[in-house]
A protein has these predicted regions:
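Polybasic/polar functional segments that serve as interface/processing modules
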Residues: 1-118
Length: 118
């Protein structure tokens, strides 16, 4: 049994996003780069993007030495879901502000879950 956290997992949902941004690997790549840079994270490679056909969304994954950063976009609903797991403590990041800037989000919910605590 652990009595301390082994990291934090952020679960982020952003609603009312611009559908064209949610279909853009460029926009999502810039967002990932900003998250990584501002939080001092360390990529273990390049992001991998899967673009769904037609008007579908994008699934993205970036392996980090600290764990991972992932997103799933739903342009038809104006929604992006983001998951960031870090095995070390990180400062709070302005998810609301950054997702409004990057994707035009109207509403952002953020949950920070300590991992490994019993």
């Amino acid at each position: 049994m652990l009595d301390f956290a082994l990291g934090t997992e952020w679960i982020v949902d952003a609603y009312g996003c611009d559908p064209s941004s949610l279909r853009s690997c460029t926009a999502l790549d810039r967002l990932f780069a900003r998250i990584v840079g501002e939080l001092g994270l360390h990529p273990a490679g390049q992001p991998v993007w899967h673009v769904f056909p037609g008007q579908g969304g994008i699934t993205g994954l970036l392996l980090l030495t600290e764990s991972h950063l992932a997103c799933h976009t739903y342009p038809e609903s104006g929604l992006v879901t983001i998951n960031l797991h870090c095995c070390r403590a990180r400062p709070a990041w302005p998810w609301q502000e950054r997702l409004v800037e990057a994707l035009g989000a109207a509403q952002v919910t953020v949950r920070a879950l300590p991992r490994g605590r019993s």
